Regions:
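Structured, contiguous alpha/beta core segments that scaffold functional sites
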Residues: 1-201
């Protein structure tokens, strides 16, 4: 039987022997918690980015594999001119976990035909979470009253854009306090730990 003495048994990210093996023993706990946090973010984003994309539809016979369409081809091959699917989904997952929300602008274009034409999806662009705000149009300024819009400000050009919800894919974490936006994973973990510490002292 072959064995490899360099292989360590399973250990957590804060295991002292593991940290020593990685050459980061003696590091302050606050720094270690940051290292652990971002290591977990990296693992989550890379795992999601590697997952295959499958396209389904609801039919009278139940859920079945659907025929590929333009959106599916973009997600599978190249969401936009700057990103591969793995880079795209990795960035989406990082924004979702770290900021609580990830936003993707669905850019469309009008394809003119001999008689009329049609709107098609051209590409998909990630809007950094820190630069995007959810807006509920109570007064009907942008359209029908009560509709949801996404206000995005380009930090490089300084220009702002307002997109209807139909043109934005919004991914949020599993915990939401208003039903519209997700809470950052860091805040969820902090609240959980503080709750456990509080119960331990009761």
């Amino acid at each position: 039987m072959l064995s490899n003495k360099a292989i360590r048994p399973a250990a957590g990210a804060t295991d002292e022997k593991l940290l020593e093996w990685l050459g980061i023993s003696g590091t302050p706990k606050k720094v270690l918690s940051e290292v652990t946090y971002f290591t977990c973010l990296k693992m989550l984003s890379e795992t999601l980015a590697k997952m295959p994309i499958k396209f389904y539809q609801q039919t009278d016979k139940g859920v079945e594999r659907a025929e590929p369409n333009a959106a599916y081809e973009l997600l599978k091959t190249r969401p936009n001119s700057q990103m591969t699917p793995s880079v795209f989904w990795g960035a989406v997952e990082n924004n979702r976990n770290h900021c609580g929300n990830a936003y993707v602008w669905i850019r469309r274009q009008f394809n003119r035909k001999k008689y009329g034409g049609e709107m098609v999806i051209k590409d998909l662009w990630i809007m950094p979470s820190a630069d995007t705000t959810i807006v509920i149009d109570d007064k009907g300024v942008f359209g029908a009253a009560g509709d949801i819009y996404y206000w995005y400000t380009d930090k490089y050009s300084g220009e702002s854009y307002v997109f209807p919800s139909a043109d934005v894919m919004h991914f949020k974490t599993s915990l939401s306090f208003d039903g519209l936006s997700g809470a950052p994973v860091r805040d969820i973990l902090a609240a959980t730990i503080q709750g456990e510490i509080g119960r331990a002292h009761v």
